[in-house]
C-alpha cells in the first residue's frame, strides 16, 4: 500500500501538481516523495519585470518558493529580462507592449527589493537569481528553429488568449509564439526540477516539460497556485482594477485594506497569505479580518509596524481620533450636491483651500478615506451613503468626519 508522504507545506494553497501519481512510489512520478530525497531540488519561478510594483497576488508563488527554501531546496528565480521585452501573451486579448532593456532593468531592481521580506536571500545555497538573457540572447537561428519545430501552430492556438484572439480575428504576431518556448527553454537552461506558477501558467510549464524531454533532461514537475481574488471579491487582484494591496504600501494603507476583506475571502486569504493554522482561526469574522490585516502587514512592516497601523486605524474609524488628536471635526454632506468629486469635497470640507490643491494632494498620495489611500484624481461619489460616518484625511494631521 502506498502511503501519501506529501508534506503539509507542499499542498497548502496548491491548486494542482502535475504529474502527480498518488499510486506510485517512484520519485520521478511523485513530487511529495522527491522533496524528501537527499538532494535539494531546483525550484524555478520566473517573473517578467513589466512594471515597478508587486501586489499580494504576485506574492503567492513566492511564498510557496520560500516554503521550498525552508525545506532545504534551492529557489531559482528567473528574471525575464529577455522575455519581458516580448511580454507574456497569457490571458491577453491583444498584443503586449514591448519594453526597452533599460525599463526592464529598472523594474527588475524594484521587484527584487520588494521580494526581500518573502524570500531567504541570506542562507547559502538557498537562492539563485538568474537573468534569462544569459542564454536566450545567445540563441542562434538553428537553435530557434529547433525550438519552433517542437510545437505546432494548432498547439499554440489552443493556448488561452491566442484562441480568443484568433476567433475574434485580432492580430497574433509571430514573436508571441516564441514566448512559451522561451519560458520553457529557461527550465532547460537552469535544470529545473519543479516550476511554480499560477493556474494560468499550466500551458507554459508543460512546454518546459516537453523541451526538457526533447533535450534529454528529466521533465520538471509543475506546481500551480490559485489566482488571488482582489479586495472587491469579484475579479483577480489587479492594480488596474484598484482592488489590490501593494507590497510597497505603507503599513496603515495595507492594514486598512486587508481589514475590510470580504468574509467569504477570509479562508482563502489566510491560506494563501499566511502560515497560520487554519483550524485555530477566530470564529468571529471581524476578529478574523483584524488578525489577517495584522499578520500580513507584519510580514512587510514588522510586528511593531502592524501594531501601530492597527491602533491608528482603530483610532480613526472607531474612536474618531488619530494619533494624538483628541477629536475630529465634522462636515455635513447635506451642504454639498451629489454627485461630487473627491477634489471638490476636500475643498468644501475645509481640508484644503481649493479643488486644484485637492487634486495635487491626491496625486501626491496624501488623501485617505478610513485609512485607505485614494489615488484617482477623478474619483467621484454618486451618493452620500458611500461616505457617511467615514473619516477623510489629508496629510498626517488633517482629519474630518463626514456625517449626513
UniProtKB/Swiss-Prot annotation:
It is found in: Cytoplasm. Catalyzes the attachment of tyrosine to tRNA(Tyr) in a two-step reaction: tyrosine is first activated by ATP to form Tyr-AMP and then transferred to the acceptor end of tRNA(Tyr). It catalyses: tRNA(Tyr) + L-tyrosine + ATP = L-tyrosyl-tRNA(Tyr) + AMP + diphosphate + H(+). ATP binds at residue 239. A motif ('HIGH' region) lies at residues 49-58. GO terms for cellular component: cytosol. Belongs to the class-I aminoacyl-tRNA synthetase family. TyrS type 2 subfamily. Homodimer. Its EC number is 6.1.1.1. PROSITE patterns: S4. This is Tyrosine--tRNA ligase. Its main location: cytoplasm. The keyword ATP-binding applies. A motif ('KMSKS' region) lies at residues 236-240.
